[in-house]
Amino acid sequence: MARILVTGGTGYIGSHTVVELMQKGYDVVIVDNLSNSNVDMLDGVTSIVGQRPPFEQVDCNDAVAMQQVFEKYTDIEAVIHFAASKAVNESVEQPLKYYRNNLLSLITLLEQMQVYNVHHIVFSSSCTVYGQPSEEHLPVDETAPIQMALSPYGNTKQINEEILRDQAYSDANLHATILRYFNPVGAHPSAMIGELPNGVPQNLLPYVTQTAAGLRQQLKVYGNDYNTHDGSCIRDYIYVVDLAKAHVKAVERMLNGEADEQVEVFNLGTGRGLSVLELVNTFMAVNGVDVPYEIVGRREGDIEQVWAKPDKANQKLGWVADTPIEEVLKSAWQWEKKLRSL
């Protein structure tokens, strides 16, 4: 089977994707500098698939180190690029860090791919490129207008998409698949891998699970005066395992020569919007635990409501995110309990 280079492969989505690739029989090599992930994730991956994936502790911005990776693994046929700094709030405080890490890593990768004749890349993008879509663009499909980014993080995703398009235009051999994720949640059903925030969680569900586990006194719900049915923000929460499977489908589509265009874009979501309060209440109901929460003021930069229209991915990738949210929320709690030995 083909070898797939996975940058950021010890991270949350990366580790789940490595599992799906290996279970499909692909050879992988993980590149990660461990700046916002933990090498222990490799133990979890090994427990699930029965084999330890090759791992290189390398910064994707380091051209010499990346060159050595391509020299060592001469059978790489595709790259899945997850490695990035990803905290929206931090990006506002440290924009240069985000522009350096997120732009330079992709540029370095594309340069090495060109040298070593690797022609397929899957890029980890985000629904943040759509900003707050107007009502006529809900649910959001791939033709929705790209809005001005609300953070340097979001801006790096937009710029990287343009870099990929420009590079593909200049290199007829390059094929890129841009995957715009909605809100990844949950953990592998084995509870061997899951979301492991370094420091303060950036996403809602780790806050919920940590509050349920007693690590936090109460959850803050930012705003209950939005123009939604219960006043809280609405998001499209997609199970991380379903999301990981979409990456395998995207790689296969390119390697099989099935792509319609040199650069393809897919929205990855469930097609269903769920409010913050619905998520919290469903979590409590399915897990039989209490999550104390308080309503506080809106958080700057939060989008009111966004959810995907995933028809294109359903049809062209032959993929669907259909794991019930109840199962997803149970998986998140199993992972948290394992982490805390509860």
Region locations from a protein language model:
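Conserved mid-core alpha-helix of short-chain dehydrogenase/reductase
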Residues: 65, 108-112, 242-245
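N-terminal Rossmann-like NAD(P) cofactor-binding module of classical short-chain dehydrogenase/reductase
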Residues: 77-80, 122
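Catalytic helix-loop patch of NAD(P)-dependent Rossmann-fold dehydrogenases
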Residues: 93, 100, 104-111, 129-183, ...
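Conserved cofactor-binding/catalytic machinery of classical short-chain dehydrogenase/reductase
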Residues: 62, 105-108, 120, 159-160, ...
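C-terminal substrate-binding subdomain of Rossmann-fold SDR/epimerase-dehydratase oxidoreductases
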Residues: 205-342
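Conserved NAD(P)H cofactor-binding loop of Rossmann-fold oxidoreductase domains
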Residues: 83-86, 125-126
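N-terminal Rossmann/SDR dinucleotide-binding element
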Residues: 2-78, 200
